[in-house]
Protein backbone atom coordinates (compact mmCIF):
# COMPACT_ATOMS: atom_id res chain seq x y z
CA UNK A 1 0.00 0.00 0.00
CA UNK A 2 1.34 3.41 -0.97
CA UNK A 3 0.95 6.14 1.64
CA UNK A 4 -0.04 8.59 -1.09
CA UNK A 5 -2.07 8.42 -4.30
CA UNK A 6 -5.19 10.58 -4.15
CA UNK A 7 -3.43 13.28 -6.12
CA UNK A 8 -2.54 10.90 -8.98
CA UNK A 9 -4.67 9.58 -11.84
CA UNK A 10 -2.11 7.09 -13.15
CA UNK A 11 -0.22 4.35 -11.37
CA UNK A 12 3.52 4.70 -11.07
CA UNK A 13 5.55 3.04 -13.80
CA UNK A 14 7.00 -0.20 -12.47
CA UNK A 15 10.47 0.94 -13.43
CA UNK A 16 10.00 4.13 -11.42
CA UNK A 17 8.66 2.13 -8.49
CA UNK A 18 11.78 -0.03 -8.43
CA UNK A 19 13.94 3.07 -8.73
CA UNK A 20 12.04 4.92 -6.00
CA UNK A 21 11.43 2.17 -3.46
CA UNK A 22 13.80 1.88 -0.50
CA UNK A 23 12.48 -1.15 1.39
CA UNK A 24 15.40 -3.29 0.18
CA UNK A 25 17.70 -1.36 2.51
CA UNK A 26 15.58 0.65 4.94
CA UNK A 27 13.98 -2.58 6.22
CA UNK A 28 16.83 -2.40 8.72
CA UNK A 29 14.93 0.43 10.43
CA UNK A 30 11.89 -1.77 11.15
CA UNK A 31 12.44 -2.03 14.89
CA UNK A 32 13.05 1.69 15.22
CA UNK A 33 9.98 2.50 13.12
CA UNK A 34 7.81 0.35 15.36
CA UNK A 35 9.28 1.84 18.55
CA UNK A 36 8.68 5.33 17.20
CA UNK A 37 5.12 4.42 16.26
CA UNK A 38 4.37 3.19 19.79
CA UNK A 39 5.60 6.49 21.21
CA UNK A 40 3.58 8.44 18.63
CA UNK A 41 0.43 6.54 19.56
CA UNK A 42 0.90 7.64 23.16
CA UNK A 43 1.35 11.24 22.03
CA UNK A 44 -1.90 11.07 20.04
CA UNK A 45 -3.76 10.15 23.24
CA UNK A 46 -2.57 13.37 24.88
CA UNK A 47 -4.20 15.47 22.13
CA UNK A 48 -7.42 13.47 21.89
CA UNK A 49 -6.84 11.77 18.53
CA UNK A 50 -6.82 8.34 20.18
CA UNK A 51 -8.45 7.15 23.36
CA UNK A 52 -6.66 4.90 25.84
CA UNK A 53 -8.29 1.70 24.56
CA UNK A 54 -7.36 2.49 20.97
CA UNK A 55 -3.79 3.24 21.96
CA UNK A 56 -3.55 -0.06 23.83
CA UNK A 57 -4.80 -1.96 20.78
CA UNK A 58 -2.23 -0.24 18.59
CA UNK A 59 0.59 -0.80 21.05
CA UNK A 60 -0.24 -4.47 21.46
CA UNK A 61 -0.38 -4.98 17.70
CA UNK A 62 2.90 -3.12 17.24
CA UNK A 63 4.51 -5.22 19.98
CA UNK A 64 3.48 -8.41 18.18
CA UNK A 65 4.83 -6.98 14.93
CA UNK A 66 8.11 -6.12 16.66
CA UNK A 67 8.47 -9.72 17.82
CA UNK A 68 7.81 -10.94 14.29
CA UNK A 69 10.45 -8.58 12.89
CA UNK A 70 13.01 -9.62 15.47
CA UNK A 71 12.37 -13.28 14.70
CA UNK A 72 12.80 -12.88 10.93
CA UNK A 73 13.72 -9.39 9.72
CA UNK A 74 14.46 -10.55 6.18
CA UNK A 75 10.84 -11.63 5.72
CA UNK A 76 10.10 -7.94 5.21
CA UNK A 77 11.86 -8.10 1.85
CA UNK A 78 9.11 -10.30 0.39
CA UNK A 79 6.81 -7.28 0.40
CA UNK A 80 6.40 -4.82 -2.46
CA UNK A 81 5.92 -1.93 -0.02
CA UNK A 82 7.60 1.33 -0.97
CA UNK A 83 9.53 1.69 2.27
CA UNK A 84 9.65 0.48 5.86
CA UNK A 85 7.09 3.07 6.98
CA UNK A 86 4.43 1.87 4.54
CA UNK A 87 5.28 -1.75 5.39
CA UNK A 88 4.73 -1.17 9.12
CA UNK A 89 1.50 0.74 8.52
CA UNK A 90 0.15 -1.95 6.19
CA UNK A 91 0.96 -4.70 8.68
CA UNK A 92 -0.65 -2.70 11.47
CA UNK A 93 -3.85 -2.21 9.48
CA UNK A 94 -3.88 -5.94 8.74
CA UNK A 95 -3.86 -6.56 12.50
CA UNK A 96 -6.26 -3.88 13.80
CA UNK A 97 -8.23 -2.73 10.77
CA UNK A 98 -9.16 0.90 10.21
CA UNK A 99 -7.81 1.88 13.62
CA UNK A 100 -4.34 1.50 12.15
CA UNK A 101 -5.12 4.28 9.68
CA UNK A 102 -5.32 6.80 12.52
CA UNK A 103 -1.72 6.34 13.66
CA UNK A 104 -0.15 8.61 11.05
CA UNK A 105 -2.25 11.60 12.14
CA UNK A 106 -0.01 14.64 12.52
CA UNK A 107 3.09 12.72 11.47
CA UNK A 108 5.10 12.83 8.24
CA UNK A 109 7.50 10.31 6.84
CA UNK A 110 9.99 13.18 6.97
CA UNK A 111 10.13 13.37 10.76
CA UNK A 112 9.44 9.65 11.00
CA UNK A 113 12.49 8.55 9.01
CA UNK A 114 14.69 11.15 10.69
CA UNK A 115 13.65 9.69 14.04
CA UNK A 116 14.10 6.09 12.92
CA UNK A 117 17.58 6.75 11.62
CA UNK A 118 18.68 8.56 14.77
CA UNK A 119 17.40 5.71 16.93
CA UNK A 120 19.31 3.25 14.74
CA UNK A 121 22.46 5.37 14.96
CA UNK A 122 22.24 5.49 18.75
CA UNK A 123 22.12 1.71 18.92
CA UNK A 124 24.91 1.36 16.39
CA UNK A 125 27.16 3.72 18.32
CA UNK A 126 26.81 1.47 21.36
CA UNK A 127 27.74 -1.55 19.24
CA UNK A 128 30.77 0.23 17.81
CA UNK A 129 31.95 1.47 21.19
CA UNK A 130 31.81 -2.08 22.52
CA UNK A 131 33.82 -3.38 19.56
CA UNK A 132 36.39 -0.60 19.93
CA UNK A 133 36.83 -1.45 23.60
CA UNK A 134 37.17 -5.16 22.84
CA UNK A 135 39.96 -4.43 20.36
CA UNK A 136 41.64 -2.18 22.91
CA UNK A 137 41.47 -4.99 25.44
CA UNK A 138 43.05 -7.39 22.95
CA UNK A 139 45.84 -4.90 22.30
CA UNK A 140 46.49 -4.39 26.01
CA UNK A 141 46.66 -8.13 26.64
CA UNK A 142 49.03 -8.54 23.70
CA UNK A 143 51.14 -5.68 25.03
CA UNK A 144 51.29 -7.20 28.50
CA UNK A 145 52.53 -10.49 27.05
CA UNK A 146 55.22 -8.78 24.95
CA UNK A 147 56.76 -6.12 27.18
CA UNK A 148 60.21 -7.63 26.67
CA UNK A 149 59.93 -7.95 22.88
CA UNK A 150 62.40 -5.30 21.65
CA UNK A 151 61.99 -4.31 18.01
CA UNK A 152 62.91 -1.42 15.72
CA UNK A 153 60.76 1.65 15.64
CA UNK A 154 60.51 3.24 12.21
CA UNK A 155 60.38 6.63 10.57
CA UNK A 156 60.19 6.80 6.77
CA UNK A 157 60.04 2.96 7.01
CA UNK A 158 63.69 3.02 8.05
CA UNK A 159 64.90 1.78 11.43
CA UNK A 160 65.01 4.75 13.74
CA UNK A 161 65.08 3.90 17.47
CA UNK A 162 64.37 0.74 19.43
CA UNK A 163 60.89 0.29 20.89
CA UNK A 164 58.96 -2.74 22.13
CA UNK A 165 56.08 -4.63 20.61
CA UNK A 166 54.12 -3.67 23.72
CA UNK A 167 54.73 0.02 23.04
CA UNK A 168 53.53 -0.49 19.47
CA UNK A 169 50.32 -2.13 20.72
CA UNK A 170 49.69 0.73 23.13
CA UNK A 171 49.98 3.27 20.31
CA UNK A 172 46.88 1.74 18.73
CA UNK A 173 45.10 1.69 22.08
CA UNK A 174 45.46 5.48 22.06
CA UNK A 175 44.16 5.81 18.50
CA UNK A 176 41.14 3.71 19.39
CA UNK A 177 40.51 5.84 22.46
CA UNK A 178 40.12 8.83 20.18
CA UNK A 179 37.77 6.80 17.97
CA UNK A 180 35.59 6.00 20.97
CA UNK A 181 35.65 9.63 22.07
CA UNK A 182 34.50 10.77 18.63
CA UNK A 183 31.59 8.34 18.77
CA UNK A 184 30.60 9.69 22.16
CA UNK A 185 30.73 13.25 20.87
CA UNK A 186 28.60 12.28 17.89
CA UNK A 187 26.06 10.70 20.21
CA UNK A 188 25.74 13.91 22.20
CA UNK A 189 24.82 15.90 19.12
CA UNK A 190 22.40 13.40 17.58
CA UNK A 191 20.58 12.67 20.84
CA UNK A 192 17.69 15.04 20.04
CA UNK A 193 14.35 13.85 18.73
CA UNK A 194 12.84 15.24 15.48
CA UNK A 195 9.55 13.40 15.97
CA UNK A 196 6.64 15.82 15.94
CA UNK A 197 8.18 18.19 13.39
CA UNK A 198 5.90 16.94 10.62
CA UNK A 199 6.87 17.40 7.00
CA UNK A 200 8.76 20.64 7.67
CA UNK A 201 6.60 23.18 9.55
CA UNK A 202 5.80 21.22 12.70
CA UNK A 203 2.73 19.23 13.67
CA UNK A 204 -0.69 20.88 13.96
CA UNK A 205 -1.36 18.97 17.17
CA UNK A 206 -0.23 20.38 20.51
CA UNK A 207 1.97 17.42 21.37
CA UNK A 208 4.53 17.75 24.15
CA UNK A 209 7.61 16.97 22.09
CA UNK A 210 9.91 16.94 25.10
CA UNK A 211 7.79 14.25 26.70
CA UNK A 212 7.75 12.38 23.39
CA UNK A 213 11.54 12.62 23.16
CA UNK A 214 11.83 11.17 26.66
CA UNK A 215 9.62 8.21 25.78
CA UNK A 216 12.01 7.41 22.93
CA UNK A 217 15.12 7.74 25.08
CA UNK A 218 16.37 11.00 23.57
CA UNK A 219 17.94 13.67 25.75
CA UNK A 220 15.61 16.35 24.38
CA UNK A 221 13.56 17.45 21.38
CA UNK A 222 14.94 19.43 18.45
CA UNK A 223 14.31 23.19 18.36
CA UNK A 224 13.50 23.92 14.70
CA UNK A 225 11.24 21.85 12.47
CA UNK A 226 12.91 22.87 9.19
CA UNK A 227 16.31 21.85 10.45
CA UNK A 228 14.98 18.70 12.10
CA UNK A 229 13.72 17.03 8.94
CA UNK A 230 16.70 18.26 6.89
CA UNK A 231 19.47 17.41 9.34
CA UNK A 232 21.80 14.58 8.38
CA UNK A 233 24.83 15.89 10.25
CA UNK A 234 24.79 12.76 12.38
CA UNK A 235 25.16 10.67 9.23
CA UNK A 236 28.16 12.73 8.13
CA UNK A 237 29.65 12.60 11.61
CA UNK A 238 29.29 8.85 11.90
CA UNK A 239 30.75 8.38 8.43
CA UNK A 240 33.63 10.64 9.46
CA UNK A 241 34.10 8.65 12.67
CA UNK A 242 34.12 5.47 10.63
CA UNK A 243 36.54 6.92 8.08
CA UNK A 244 39.04 7.94 10.75
CA UNK A 245 38.57 4.66 12.58
CA UNK A 246 39.19 2.71 9.39
CA UNK A 247 42.34 4.73 8.70
CA UNK A 248 43.60 3.61 12.10
CA UNK A 249 42.72 0.00 11.36
CA UNK A 250 44.32 0.25 7.93
CA UNK A 251 47.57 1.48 9.49
CA UNK A 252 47.36 -1.32 12.06
CA UNK A 253 46.92 -3.80 9.22
CA UNK A 254 49.76 -2.34 7.17
CA UNK A 255 52.15 -2.51 10.13
CA UNK A 256 51.32 -6.15 10.78
CA UNK A 257 51.48 -7.05 7.10
CA UNK A 258 55.03 -5.67 7.08
CA UNK A 259 55.92 -7.30 10.42
CA UNK A 260 54.65 -10.62 9.04
CA UNK A 261 56.56 -10.34 5.76
CA UNK A 262 59.63 -12.42 5.06
CA UNK A 263 61.68 -9.23 4.97
CA UNK A 264 60.80 -8.33 8.57
CA UNK A 265 59.66 -11.66 10.03
CA UNK A 266 58.77 -10.12 13.39
CA UNK A 267 55.48 -11.97 13.86
CA UNK A 268 53.66 -15.10 12.79
CA UNK A 269 49.93 -14.83 12.17
CA UNK A 270 47.54 -17.58 13.16
CA UNK A 271 46.38 -20.02 10.50
CA UNK A 272 42.84 -18.94 11.45
CA UNK A 273 43.26 -15.52 9.83
CA UNK A 274 45.46 -16.38 6.85
CA UNK A 275 44.96 -18.20 3.57
CA UNK A 276 47.00 -19.98 0.95
CA UNK A 277 47.69 -19.77 -2.75
CA UNK A 278 45.99 -21.88 -5.41
CA UNK A 279 49.34 -22.24 -7.18
CA UNK A 280 52.16 -21.73 -4.67
CA UNK A 281 51.88 -24.28 -1.85
CA UNK A 282 54.35 -22.48 0.42
CA UNK A 283 52.29 -19.31 0.73
CA UNK A 284 50.57 -18.11 3.91
CA UNK A 285 48.90 -14.84 3.05
CA UNK A 286 47.71 -12.21 5.56
CA UNK A 287 44.30 -11.91 3.92
CA UNK A 288 42.43 -10.72 7.01
CA UNK A 289 44.78 -7.77 7.34
CA UNK A 290 44.80 -7.02 3.62
CA UNK A 291 41.01 -6.94 3.58
CA UNK A 292 40.94 -4.56 6.54
CA UNK A 293 43.34 -2.31 4.65
CA UNK A 294 41.35 -2.65 1.44
CA UNK A 295 37.97 -1.92 3.00
CA UNK A 296 39.17 1.46 4.21
CA UNK A 297 38.54 2.91 0.74
CA UNK A 298 34.85 2.00 0.60
CA UNK A 299 34.25 3.75 3.93
CA UNK A 300 36.04 6.89 2.75
CA UNK A 301 33.90 6.72 -0.40
CA UNK A 302 30.69 6.63 1.62
CA UNK A 303 31.69 9.81 3.45
CA UNK A 304 32.56 11.59 0.22
CA UNK A 305 29.34 10.43 -1.43
CA UNK A 306 27.13 11.63 1.41
CA UNK A 307 28.90 14.97 1.59
CA UNK A 308 28.26 15.52 -2.11
CA UNK A 309 24.62 14.43 -1.74
CA UNK A 310 23.94 17.04 0.93
CA UNK A 311 26.02 19.95 -0.29
CA UNK A 312 23.45 21.34 -2.76
CA UNK A 313 20.17 20.57 -1.03
CA UNK A 314 17.73 23.37 -0.21
CA UNK A 315 15.61 23.19 2.93
CA UNK A 316 13.74 21.10 3.83
CA UNK A 317 13.40 17.41 2.94
CA UNK A 318 14.40 16.23 -0.54
CA UNK A 319 14.29 12.70 -1.95
CA UNK A 320 18.07 12.89 -2.31
CA UNK A 321 18.16 12.18 1.43
CA UNK A 322 17.08 8.61 0.74
CA UNK A 323 20.71 8.14 -0.26
CA UNK A 324 21.76 8.60 3.37
CA UNK A 325 21.20 5.00 4.40
CA UNK A 326 22.96 2.55 2.09
CA UNK A 327 26.36 4.19 2.46
CA UNK A 328 25.93 4.62 6.20
CA UNK A 329 24.78 1.04 6.75
CA UNK A 330 27.63 -0.35 4.67
CA UNK A 331 30.28 1.89 6.24
CA UNK A 332 29.32 1.11 9.83
CA UNK A 333 28.91 -2.60 9.07
CA UNK A 334 32.36 -2.56 7.51
CA UNK A 335 33.95 -0.74 10.44
CA UNK A 336 32.33 -3.11 12.93
CA UNK A 337 33.45 -6.19 10.98
CA UNK A 338 37.00 -4.87 10.74
CA UNK A 339 37.15 -4.11 14.48
CA UNK A 340 36.14 -7.69 15.22
CA UNK A 341 38.59 -9.07 12.67
CA UNK A 342 41.49 -7.00 14.04
CA UNK A 343 40.83 -8.45 17.49
CA UNK A 344 40.78 -11.95 16.00
CA UNK A 345 44.14 -11.33 14.31
CA UNK A 346 45.68 -10.53 17.70
CA UNK A 347 44.26 -13.74 19.14
CA UNK A 348 47.04 -16.18 18.32
CA UNK A 349 49.68 -13.80 16.99
CA UNK A 350 53.22 -14.92 17.82
CA UNK A 351 55.98 -12.34 18.28
CA UNK A 352 59.40 -13.67 17.22
CA UNK A 353 61.53 -12.04 19.90
CA UNK A 354 65.01 -13.10 18.68
CA UNK A 355 64.34 -11.77 15.18
CA UNK A 356 62.83 -8.55 16.54
CA UNK A 357 65.87 -7.96 18.74
CA UNK A 358 68.26 -8.76 15.89
CA UNK A 359 66.57 -6.15 13.72
CA UNK A 360 66.62 -3.60 16.55
CA UNK A 361 70.37 -4.05 16.88
CA UNK A 362 70.85 -3.23 13.21
CA UNK A 363 70.46 0.04 11.36
CA UNK A 364 72.28 2.19 13.95
CA UNK A 365 69.14 2.70 16.00
CA UNK A 366 71.35 3.69 18.95
CA UNK A 367 72.84 6.70 17.13
CA UNK A 368 70.66 9.12 19.08
CA UNK A 369 72.06 7.67 22.32
CA UNK A 370 75.57 8.59 21.20
CA UNK A 371 74.42 12.12 20.45
CA UNK A 372 72.82 12.40 23.90
CA UNK A 373 76.02 11.05 25.43
CA UNK A 374 78.02 13.82 23.75
CA UNK A 375 75.50 16.43 24.94
CA UNK A 376 75.97 15.15 28.49
CA UNK A 377 79.71 15.72 27.99
CA UNK A 378 79.08 19.35 27.08
CA UNK A 379 78.93 19.15 23.29
CA UNK A 380 76.12 21.27 21.76
CA UNK A 381 73.45 19.02 20.29
CA UNK A 382 73.78 20.27 16.72
CA UNK A 383 77.52 19.59 16.81
CA UNK A 384 76.93 16.23 18.46
CA UNK A 385 74.46 15.36 15.70
CA UNK A 386 77.14 16.01 13.08
CA UNK A 387 79.77 14.02 14.98
CA UNK A 388 77.51 10.99 15.26
CA UNK A 389 76.67 11.18 11.56
CA UNK A 390 80.37 10.92 10.77
CA UNK A 391 80.75 8.03 13.21
CA UNK A 392 77.89 6.18 11.51
CA UNK A 393 79.58 6.62 8.14
CA UNK A 394 82.75 5.07 9.58
CA UNK A 395 80.81 2.19 11.11
CA UNK A 396 79.15 1.52 7.76
CA UNK A 397 82.56 1.61 6.08
CA UNK A 398 83.87 -0.99 8.52
CA UNK A 399 80.68 -3.04 8.39
CA UNK A 400 80.22 -2.80 12.14
CA UNK A 401 77.66 -1.61 14.64
CA UNK A 402 78.43 1.64 16.48
CA UNK A 403 79.07 -0.23 19.71
CA UNK A 404 81.51 -2.50 17.88
CA UNK A 405 83.81 0.36 16.85
CA UNK A 406 87.06 0.59 18.75
CA UNK A 407 87.36 3.45 21.22
CA UNK A 408 90.15 4.91 19.12
CA UNK A 409 87.84 4.96 16.11
CA UNK A 410 85.18 6.82 18.06
CA UNK A 411 87.66 9.26 19.58
CA UNK A 412 88.80 10.43 16.16
CA UNK A 413 85.41 12.16 15.95
CA UNK A 414 85.40 13.55 19.49
CA UNK A 415 87.98 13.43 22.23
CA UNK A 416 85.32 13.50 24.97
CA UNK A 417 84.25 9.94 24.15
CA UNK A 418 85.47 7.47 26.76
CA UNK A 419 84.99 3.84 27.77
CA UNK A 420 81.74 4.78 29.49
CA UNK A 421 80.12 5.16 26.07
CA UNK A 422 79.67 1.42 25.50
CA UNK A 423 77.02 0.78 28.18
CA UNK A 424 75.15 3.80 26.79
CA UNK A 425 75.04 2.22 23.34
CA UNK A 426 73.62 -1.07 24.61
CA UNK A 427 70.12 -1.83 23.33
CA UNK A 428 68.54 -2.04 26.77
CA UNK A 429 70.04 1.30 27.73
CA UNK A 430 68.30 2.89 24.76
CA UNK A 431 64.98 1.75 26.20
CA UNK A 432 65.73 2.41 29.85
CA UNK A 433 66.51 6.08 29.27
CA UNK A 434 63.06 6.86 27.83
CA UNK A 435 61.56 7.48 31.28
CA UNK A 436 59.34 10.50 30.54
CA UNK A 437 55.61 9.84 30.41
CA UNK A 438 54.64 8.08 27.20
CA UNK A 439 58.16 6.79 26.61
CA UNK A 440 59.31 3.29 25.82
CA UNK A 441 61.16 2.52 29.07
CA UNK A 442 60.00 -0.70 30.75
CA UNK A 443 58.66 1.30 33.69
CA UNK A 444 56.62 3.62 31.48
CA UNK A 445 55.25 0.78 29.36
CA UNK A 446 54.26 -1.19 32.46
CA UNK A 447 52.59 1.90 33.87
CA UNK A 448 50.72 2.50 30.62
CA UNK A 449 49.50 -1.09 30.57
CA UNK A 450 48.28 -0.84 34.17
CA UNK A 451 46.46 2.42 33.42
CA UNK A 452 44.85 0.97 30.29
CA UNK A 453 43.71 -2.14 32.16
CA UNK A 454 42.15 -0.01 34.89
CA UNK A 455 40.32 2.03 32.26
CA UNK A 456 39.24 -0.69 29.85
CA UNK A 457 38.61 -3.85 31.86
Curated annotation (Swiss-Prot):
Its EC number is 4.3.2.1. PROSITE patterns: FUMARATE_LYASES (PS00163). Keywords: Amino-acid biosynthesis, Arginine biosynthesis, Cytoplasm, Lyase. It is found in: Cytoplasm. Belongs to the lyase 1 family. Argininosuccinate lyase subfamily. Pfam families: ASL_C2, Lyase_1. Transmembrane segments: none annotated. It comes from the Bacteria. GO terms for biological process: arginine biosynthetic process via ornithine; L-arginine biosynthetic process. GO terms for molecular function: argininosuccinate lyase activity. This is Argininosuccinate lyase. It catalyses: 2-(N(omega)-L-arginino)succinate = fumarate + L-arginine. It comes from Yersinia pestis. HAMAP family: Arg_succ_lyase. NCBIfam families: argH, PRK12308.1. One of its GO terms (cellular component) is cytosol. It is an enzyme of class 4 (lyase). Pathway: Amino-acid biosynthesis; L-arginine biosynthesis; L-arginine from L-ornithine and carbamoyl phosphate: step 3/3.
Amino acid sequence: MALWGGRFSQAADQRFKQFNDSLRFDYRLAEQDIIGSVAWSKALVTVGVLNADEQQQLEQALSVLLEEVQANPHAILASDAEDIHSWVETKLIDKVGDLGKKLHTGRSRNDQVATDLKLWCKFQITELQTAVQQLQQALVMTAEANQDAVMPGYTHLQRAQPVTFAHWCLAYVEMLSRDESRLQDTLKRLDVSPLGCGALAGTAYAIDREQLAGWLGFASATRNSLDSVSDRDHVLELLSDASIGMVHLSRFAEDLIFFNSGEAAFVDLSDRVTSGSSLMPQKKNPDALELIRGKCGRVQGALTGMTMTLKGLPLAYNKDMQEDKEGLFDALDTWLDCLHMAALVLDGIQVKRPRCKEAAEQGYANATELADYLVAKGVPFREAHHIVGEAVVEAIRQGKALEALALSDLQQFSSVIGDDVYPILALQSCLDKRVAKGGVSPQQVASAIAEAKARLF
